[in-house]
Structures are given as C-alpha cells and as structure tokens.
Amino acid sequence: MTALEPRPGVLLRVLPPSLYAGRASKVVERSMLAYSRMWLVFVSGVFEPLFYLLAFQVGFGRLVDDVVGPGGQPMSYVAFVAPALLASSAMNGAVLDSTYNVFFKFRYAKTYDAMLATPIGPLDVALGEISWCVLRGGLYAVAFFAVMLGMGLVTSAWAVLLIPVALLIAFAFAAVGMTCATFLRSPSQFDYIQLAVMPMFLFSTTFYPLTVYPEALRVVVQCFPLYHGIELMRKLSVGVFDVAMLGHLAYLLALAALGLWGVSRRLSRLLLS
C-alpha cells in the first residue's frame, strides 16, 4: 500500500473521497509536531484543575461538612467536587483547543486550505482536530485522576471509568466548539464562547447538587451538556449505578455525533465551495 492509497474502513466505503479519505491521523501527527516545540504550553494545561482541587482540599474542604453524594451516601466535599472538576477540565481544554486554535488556523494561517489541497477531506480535518483535543484531554485526565488517587479521593474501582468519560466529554465539546469556531469572524467574538462556557462551569452542579435549585431552574440546568458529564462522573467515582446514567451517556454521544456532523458540513461548505 502506497502513501496515497486510502486505508480500508467502513467510512471509506460509504462516504465520498472528497469528504473523507481516511487520513485523520495525519492531522493529529501535524499537531504533535507543532506542539513538540511548545511542550511547556502543552503540559501547563494540567495545572489549572489541579490548583482548584488543591484549593478545595486545603481551604473549602476544611470548612464544609460532608455532603450527600450519589445514592444518598455521605462523602467529603472535596470528593464531591473532584469528579466535577475533572469533567470541567475536559470541557475547558476541548473548547480552548477547538475554538482559539481552529479559528486562527482557519481564518489567518489558512492551514485547512493547505490540508485540503492534499488527499485529505473535511471530515479528516474535523476528526483529526477533535482527536487531538481528545488525546490532550486524555493526558490531563490521567494526571488529574492520579492526583485524586494520591489524595485518597478514589473510593471505588469503578472510578477508573472517569478517564474514558473525560475523553467522551472532550470529544463532544471539541466537536461543538470546532463547529462554533467556523462561525466566528473576529477574535472579539470569543467572548460569546466564554458567555456559554462560564455559566456551564458555575451552574452545572459543579460545586453543589441539583437539589439547591428551584424546580423550574433544575430543568434548565439539566439541559447543560456539562451537567450530564458531571453526573455521570460523580456516580462512577463512588460506584453508584442507575438507569439515569444511560441518559447522560446518550446525551453526550448524541452531542458528539451532532458536533462532528456540523463541523464536517461547515468545513465542506466553506473550503470546498
């Protein structure tokens, strides 16, 4: 098989070559080479959520009593917040990578125009950029989980599933974030992105349970994508399972699929028309 021959796969059989050529890994390789010269920037992303976690352990954790966790069992406030911070970290990292970086590659560097001049399709670009966000988020998730383990915040063997859930959260938000980036016209419009991300971080039960809200507001909060990621992680962290977890999982999978479809269509329309 030569370098220009497409690799076999289901998508290659059902999608036209102009949309998908099976070379998303080449986009990931490009990102790896680019960040090999900026490894300090790459590594620094893991510290922000860790600082939050340490602040809660040293400060708030000593001031707040145990709270009621999933399944009605008591848990320390730090253990309650830790899975939510991991989910928030996956969201923030994915949104940052898939909006700022993608915007400048798309609007100024014209990176994607150059890519599409090669045997690479818009879906390859979308999958490659999203996969890079997921890879980066996965490394951060492993580091965060290791700190949780060292701080004694992991009480169930099921908590190891926090890492794949973090990858799913990163994929979903990266896909949606990349789609949004294609609509931006100037750097000042990134404020709109933060206007959506910040309320989700603050109000998606990150720091307190859903029951603190009035009934009407609970419905609004339950529409937030981050809420579903946090609830899924929080239950896995203590080994509690219920039917609602399937709903949380389905929501994130649907969001990921919708975002991937949206960004591939946008790139096709903007770069191939």
Briefly describe each language-model feature range.
Residues 1-273:
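Hydrophobic transmembrane alpha-helices and immediately adjacent juxtamembrane helices
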